[in-house]
């Protein structure tokens, strides 16, 4: 049972998440803000954290760039959901790969644990993130040699479609890859709900 909630701006679609996930009071969430660690703008991490807390969920923060493998393994195993924040997708993949977390997350998702991905956390669910180079800087991930990502879905999320300040970047991705990759653009008020192999787009496009 594979269950994913993929969004551009999690706080803006939190109601859609609750419709999808149900009551999250007392649910424990492995909260991974790693992608934001190399970004100057990171308000979205606090917004997501606060949204969970206001519904009575427990946040168990996990920064892959500093955590040990034992800590990573323990937190992913004991908590009920996995949330991966926005930020730099290449830095996120570098740390997922370096720590071995990518394989652990794949195993937990295949076993039925819910995955929640916001922006970079949504794009990392694709088979490969080479297409993200028009939105994120590779300079933040000097150790990254392979763009193979989590491969949780068979499509490629393009977040923030028509939303400032990513209008040009999102359109460049679409112009470049629309004929070669199964892209799925979503704006800040839309989300992709995945149940096994079924994909549903929720929310109204407001571009």
From Swiss-Prot:
Keywords assigned by UniProt, alphabetized: Hydrolase, Protease, Serine protease
Q: Which SUPFAM superfamilies match?
A: Class I glutamine amidotransferase-like
Top-level EC class as recorded in UniProt: hydrolase
**Catalytic residues of the enzyme:** 119, 160
Top-rank taxon of the source lineage equals Bacteria
In terms of Pfam families, this protein maps to: Peptidase_S51
Q: From the UniProt record, which GO molecular function terms apply?
A: serine-type peptidase activity
Instruction: Name the Gene Ontology biological process terms.
Output: proteolysis
Instruction: Note the InterPro entries from the entry.
Output: Class_I_gatase-like, Peptidase_S51
Query: Which residue windows are coiled coil?
Result: none
Q: What is its EC number?
A: 3.4.21.-
Spans through the membrane: none
**UniProt cross-references to PANTHER family, sorted A to Z:** ALPHA-ASPARTYL DIPEPTIDASE, PROTEASE S51 ALPHA-ASPARTYL DIPEPTIDASE
Family membership: Belongs to the peptidase S51 family.
Question: What name is this protein filed under?
Answer: Uncharacterized peptidase PM1590
